[in-house]
């Protein structure tokens, strides 16, 4: 018989994930169906989102190989029935206090930084780049981890060195760029552009650097269709684009600059977002989401 979730101690919770203690060496990482936008956790969940994020992470952990935090299969007996398919047994690590972001294309906060300074996180870039420009080479653009509700703050490589030391900072940069190079080639072969992604690492008891948290999911990455790609315009993406677009439209009646809570999402936006997440998983993995462990919503 599987344990119940309340038999584990709740250790921490974020915008999307919750962490529970299994024993001294293992944790239960649970991905919820919560969705966040513009630093708000919305009141309307996206059915199956937690399962998609978990399936995508497991897929890419297997593709990448190497050292990661997984400590059990997706149907591990230690996973409670109520979170089966959206929870993983992972090793307990000393997490590195840096968001390891890598960008192969210019968009989002990177574009804002570039337009203001000609650089992103202190990395100088050529003149004349526009929205969605491919960068000459992928760049490591780290961020400090923010508290729930706050923005992650872009930092320079020198600031990473100040936080964790030269040796670990260099290893973080090298490992992040390596993951991006392999994952972007993998995605490109499937007609998908991996514009950027955010990784997290931890240290095990032996001081070894371990890839952790989620990896290459639609929440932590920008995926664009290769077909129709054109620099100079905003690209359609395989994530919560429908949610962001609706929240900033007149239909929502919500003012992003206000301190008010965003309204509930209409059913058609929920359905479209769920379908987009599943499409991302199936196109990139080549697998059917129907075959993933756990009950479908």
Swiss-Prot record:
GO CC annotation: cytoplasm
Gene Ontology biological process terms from the UniProt entry: 'de novo' IMP biosynthetic process
Pathway: Purine metabolism; IMP biosynthesis via de novo pathway; 5-amino-1-(5-phospho-D-ribosyl)imidazole-4-carboxamide from 5-amino-1-(5-phospho-D-ribosyl)imidazole-4-carboxylate: step 1/2
GO MF, one annotated term: phosphoribosylaminoimidazolesuccinocarboxamide synthase activity
CDD domains membership: SAICAR_synt_Sc
EC class name: ligase
UniProt KW keywords: ATP-binding, Ligase, Nucleotide-binding, Purine biosynthesis
The protein's Enzyme Commission number: 6.3.2.6
Protein name: Phosphoribosylaminoimidazole-succinocarboxamide synthase
Gene: purC
